[in-house]
């Protein structure tokens, strides 16, 4: 996809084409010759960490079913999904904000634009450059971005949906 090629060419970032992932997932649902490993929805898929707002961060095991339920919950709250949508993943990769929104994008066939570390100016630039439509931030991230004097220097009109969570 054009956005992915532009990101790879200009920023030296690895690009994962989630449209290809989405197409492959769709193909797998109809491929009768495919032998899948024997796992249940209750089995652990990954471990994330809480934000630590009530003390120290804690490891949380998420099952495959948790990931599907997270996807369905986000889908019901996010108006623009599927091919054509562009998600900004700015959250930490060890927490549900980063991992969850990434999984959400893959399951939906969206383009995911990934940020290695939180950089509010880079977030504004990415929204403008890649026409980000969806983003998920921790409240402190939103506070920092909104307080920037430079926020008015960027075209953020593509942004249609902002979700937040992870701290009070």
Which residues does each predicted region cover?
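Conserved AMP-binding/adenylation subdomain of ANL enzymes
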Residues: 68-86, 94-133, 148
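Conserved G/P- and acidic residue-centered "switch" motifs that form tight phosphate/ATP-binding loops
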Residues: 53, 109, 166
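Conserved pre-ATP/AMP-binding loop-to-beta segment of ANL
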Residues: 31-49, 56, 80-86
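Short beta-strand->loop structural element characteristic of the AMP-binding/adenylate-forming
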Residues: 1, 14-18, 58-61, 89, ...
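ANL superfamily adenylate-forming
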Residues: 3-41
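Short, structured coil segments at secondary-structure junctions
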Residues: 10-12, 108-109, 158
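Adenylate-forming
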Residues: 91, 132-168
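Conserved AMP-binding A3 loop
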Residues: 45-72
